[in-house]
Curated annotation (Swiss-Prot):
Annotated metabolic or biological route of this protein: Glycan biosynthesis; glycogen biosynthesis
GO biological process, one term: glycogen biosynthetic process
Keywords linked to the UniProt accession: Glycogen biosynthesis, Glycosyltransferase, Transferase
E.C. number(s) listed in UniProt: 2.4.1.21
Similarity-based family: Belongs to the glycosyltransferase 1 family. Bacterial/plant glycogen synthase subfamily.
Pfam families: Glyco_transf_5 (PF08323), Glycos_transf_1 (PF00534)
Name this protein carries in UniProt: Glycogen synthase
GO molecular function, one term: alpha-1,4-glucan glucosyltransferase (UDP-glucose donor) activity
One of the record's GO cellular component terms: cytosol
């Protein structure tokens, strides 16, 4: 079986979010399962530099201009690159300029990605043709539409990593992207009077997956579906919507092998984690105190991630003797709020604005609790890293967070199921109650250690996900 992933980023070549982590790990896991898997990406500068052995496959004139299709390898995975400097050779973000404005030609840049994905199933590379084309998020959303226009030369899977980003463009761009105007209607890619790349993926794909079973259920409800609930409910009834949980790349996230940690450890040497905490406290300007539970945030600072709730609950966390270490960037109001808290509570609150992959490992290895209070969370990887590192996740019961973290309730503790702390309602009071439960468990060190070991024992490997995708592909064939 031959599978092509169509997407816009891949860790470690280029990363703006969790999508990159998935594409950095899933194809390799599928190859290990015996599936001939390759990836198609735009040749953004960082990606182009990283694929050093790229050779020309073919050149084509397209609706978006002249392109060269390249093929090379990265970390043992075959990579196709769409080399179109006039579209992709731009510094910084792949999606917007330095003023955070979306590029005005994004409609062409990402329509081309979908078009090439479809053409691969029609022999664009004469030596390799996919049986399944697996597109990810709105950037690749037109892929199933182009396949449908082509008479479906391959089966298509569309994975929703985040339904909030819908890839909306003016309707007149139908003239620019070489799809029939008949596709522009409510039973197609039209949404609220515009073209939606996301809806194209949802409507035309043979099967839709969400990145967790709970999120797959949630997106059939209005509060999570951003207007797509009717279509998603229909796909659910047709048996064409399912949830497959993301995994963790053990090669990158593993406390016993993590070279970015001052001190490596495993579930049998958890006492070594204390040195990581000490060094993290020093690095973040916090008081060195092994008795104070260290809560951490590694996140985009947005209301979706519930970081306003953390700011609201922070006085209660500090009053009980806790510390906070935060790494992230985003909403300027939230950034200012956390910086002000750090200034007001020196030694108790440490804040680094920005994102540094290496430092996120040090936080995960040194903190006691990782906070993930999201209003919605399709899968979430942060809590999975927390589980791996014995850094107990404190999460809201939504999406993938609900599927992966079990609350330290008395029943779960008695049954050996507890792996963290879970709260229900998206408000600061509910969050504070969970923080209070974390302090109660912290006051019982042997019980805390027991829950850490339970957490570290969980298996969220990519092999599990790769096997689930293989079963799905086989059902479609």
């Amino acid at each position: 079986m031959q599978v092509l992933h169509v997407c816009s980023e891949m860790f470690p070549l280029l990363k703006t979010g969790g999508l990159a982590d998935v594409i950095g790990a899933l194809p390799a896991a599928q190859i290990a399962e015996g599936i001939d898997t390759r990836v198609l990406l735009p040749a953004f500068p960082d990606i182009r530099r990283g694929v050093v052995d790229a050779q020309v496959v073919t050149r084509r004139d397209t609706f978006a201009g002249r392109i060269t299709l390249l093929y090379g390898h990265f970390n043992g995975v075959g990579i196709y690159l769409i080399d179109a400097p006039h579209l992709y050779d731009r510094p910084g973000s792949p999606y917007h300029d330095t003023n955070q404005h979306a590029y005005t030609d994004n409609v062409l840049r990402f329509a081309l990605l979908g078009w090439v994905g479809s053409e691969m199933a029609s022999g664009l590379d004469p030596f390799w043709r996919p049986d399944v084309v697996h597109a990810h998020d709105w950037h690749a959303g037109l892929t199933p539409a182009y396949l449908a226009a082509r008479g479906r030369p391959a089966k298509s899977v569309f994975t929703v990593h985040n339904l909030a980003y819908q890839g909306m463009f003016y309707s007149w761009h139908m003239n620019d992207i070489e799809l029939p105007w008949s596709f522009y209607n409510m039973h197609g890619l039209e949404f609220n009077g515009q073209i939606s790349f996301l809806k194209a993926g949802l409507y035309y794909a043979d099967h839709i997956t969400a990145v967790s079973p709970t999120y797959a259920r949630e997106i059939t409800e209005p509060q999570y579906a951003y207007g797509m609930e009717g279509l998603l409910r229909q796909r659910h009834h047709e048996g064409r919507l399912s949830g497959i949980l993301n995994g963790v790349d053990d090669g990158i996230w593993s406390p016993q092998n993590d070279l970015l940690l001052p001190m490596r450890y495993d579930r049998d040497t958890l006492e070594e984690k204390a040195e990581n905490k000490r060094q993290l406290q020093i690095a973040m300007g916090l008081k060195v105190d092994d008795k104070a539970p260290l809560f951490a945030v590694v996140s985009r600072l947005t209301s979706q991630k519930g970081l306003d709730l953390v700011l609201e609950a922070l006085p209660g966390l500090l009053e009980q003797g806790g510390q906070l270490a935060l790494l992230g960037a985003g909403d300027p109001v939230l950034q200012e709020g956390f910086l002000a808290a750090a200034a007001e509570h020196p030694g108790k609150v440490g804040v680094q604005i920005g994102y540094h992959e290496a430092f996120s490992h040090r936080i995960m290895g040194g903190a006691d609790v990782i906070l993930v209070p999201s209003r919605f969370e399709p899968c979430g990887l942060t809590q999975l890293y927390g589980l791996k590192y014995g850094t107990l996740p404190l999460v809201r019961r939504t999406g993938g967070l609900a599927d992966t973290v079990s609350d330290s309730s008395l029943e779960n503790l008695a049954d050996g199921l507890a792996t963290g702390f879970v709260f229900e309602d998206s408000n600061a009071l509910s969050l504070l109650r969970a923080i209070r439960r974390a302090f109660v468990l912290w006051s019982r060190p042997s019980l805390w250690r027991y829950v850490q070991r339970q957490a570290m024992n969980m298996d969220f490997s990519w092999q599990v996900a790769a096997n689930s995708y293989r079963e799905l592909y086989q059902r479609l064939m």
